[in-house]
Amino acid sequence: LMNNLNKHTEYLNSKDKHIEYLNNKVYFTKDNRLLTPNAQPVMMGWEDPIMKDAASLICHNKGKILNVGFGLGLIDTYIQSHQVQEHWIIEAHPDVQNKMKNDGWGKKSNVTCLFNKWQNVYDELPKFDGIYFDTWKESLDLFHKIVPNLLKPGGKYTYWSPNDLEVHSVFKTNEYKVENGITKLDYISSNQKYYNISKDLFNYKLITKKL
């Protein structure tokens, strides 16, 4: 019971922080950082090599790809380099949406931009060959519950979060994995320079749906 209460409290705290984030401005800096008004990092340019690896994973068959949370657009730029069939982006923050519009993301022939919270549009989404999820200060628990419904057979899903215990809670039980055909694999960036960053700080993982 206490574990359930603690999880519920963590979820509510995460929800409050995410709402606060969406209601405040963010700033894009010249040195490729995305910051909150009090200079908290939302996304940093040094994440680039990890985003490159993540894009390679989800673009495994150059099919239909979804990214939730645009940020600096690092992974979306790499997704475009794979010349995928369809590239969907969900972004909820108004300032990031404006940056995307100014940079012409909505004009790319294979890109569909959904300027909304994922909770408002997920039931209208098609199935994808690859999915990446990285929103700021938001619990991933709810999104992870719908991942199996959004993936095609053989599809791959990656995410990046500093709160590993909360993030992986949905996937801990064998019953869940058997029911949804999920195989969980540890994944660390192939770039040795970022090995310790991704392993120790972010616990970066790959989850792939079986054929």
Predicted regions and their residues:
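Conserved class I S-adenosyl-L-methionine
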Residues: N61-G73
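Class I SAM-dependent methyltransferase Rossmann-like catalytic core
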Residues: K15-K62
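Conserved SAM-binding loop of SAM-dependent methyltransferases across substrates and taxa
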Residues: L72-V84
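Conserved SAM-binding motif I beta-strand of class I
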Residues: E86-E91, Y159
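Short, conserved SAM-binding/catalytic segment
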Residues: K99-V111
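Active-site segment flanking the S-adenosylmethionine/decSAM binding pocket
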Residues: L72, V111-D164
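C-terminal substrate-binding/active-site "lid" region of AdoMet-derived donor-dependent transferases
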Residues: V96-Q97, S139-L211
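Short beta->alpha hinge that forms the Motif I/post-I loop of the SAM-binding pocket
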Residues: F70, E91-P94
